[in-house]
């Protein structure tokens, strides 16, 4: 069996913005962004490739992004054209208890001189229907270009702060390894599944932001995106699912993770502020759970929660006297949603729903205030306790 497919998409953004501090009348800006992607893919199933049946996949893709960002008050007029031509190929061999996938991707980025070669390997061992183990190796990269978050100008201490790219910025490369075991088992009328996974990612030339102080021309505070020596992200997670038909389902997971630079990096221009090896805004522990149930034919509900562990977060002076590194509390964010469905006729149903997001109002308590606040000093759940209702028609 052979399959050939093509795809394309296009998106245009025309955005007016204001990133001012102290009611600065010159802080208006305009951004135009055009992105389009086109590609094709071939998938073929063969009775034998070398030593076993296999599925072969190959494709080509082209991405183009044209960005023009103007902020006259900050003397910024940035034009960036990103063009990426890619080719990828992979082959998946399916044997009795072993599945092996080997693939590679080749990217030519116009902002990077050399071709980027990204291989990947995946081994799946499945000796029984209810048990499998997997090993994976993959690579990736981030190009030295301006990303959407770099266009936003923060307000710190009543002054604007912007992100710029360092001269000679190199691409960030990653090498990732992971291994997992997946076991499904039943007891009585309950079905359950347990997944245990370990992961390790080595980042080379990792991106980080360093504060440079004020720009002498625009007067804005500047953070520069630079290459660090490297970073390591590693840890383990466990996921468990248990269900009793549609009457009740529970899914929960927990992750232990360490995210560390190999060498300490500076985030503040204040010499009294220590450099850090721990990546900011990355908790060492996080988890989730979801419980859903349909006790009645027309009624169902779900209760979910997200746990976010403690982090370190940079806090720039302005509302506070000096730059400092904050140690945040942990958060447990609970959400409840109720649904009731009315059958209007054979072809139309009406669902009424309502609930509460962040039931116990687990929200940041030390937000900066006033015109001298640090607009980037924000962490934890994105919204306080929120009530909602809604309706949905469907067939």
What residue spans do the PLM features occupy?
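Gram-negative outer-membrane beta-barrel transporters
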Residues: 94-97, 199-202, 224-316
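Outer-membrane beta-barrel strand-turn architecture
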Residues: 1, 44-50, 92-97, 117, ...
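Face-selective signature of the C-terminal outer-membrane beta-barrel domain
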Residues: 1-113, 191-200, 235-237, 243, ...
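Membrane-embedded beta-barrel scaffold of Gram-negative outer-membrane proteins
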Residues: 3-19, 126, 134, 168-226, ...
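Residues that define the transmembrane beta-barrel architecture of outer-membrane proteins
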Residues: 32-36, 79-85, 115-117, 173-177, ...
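Structural signature of Gram-negative outer-membrane beta-barrels, strongest in the C-terminal barrel
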Residues: 53, 76-202, 255, 292
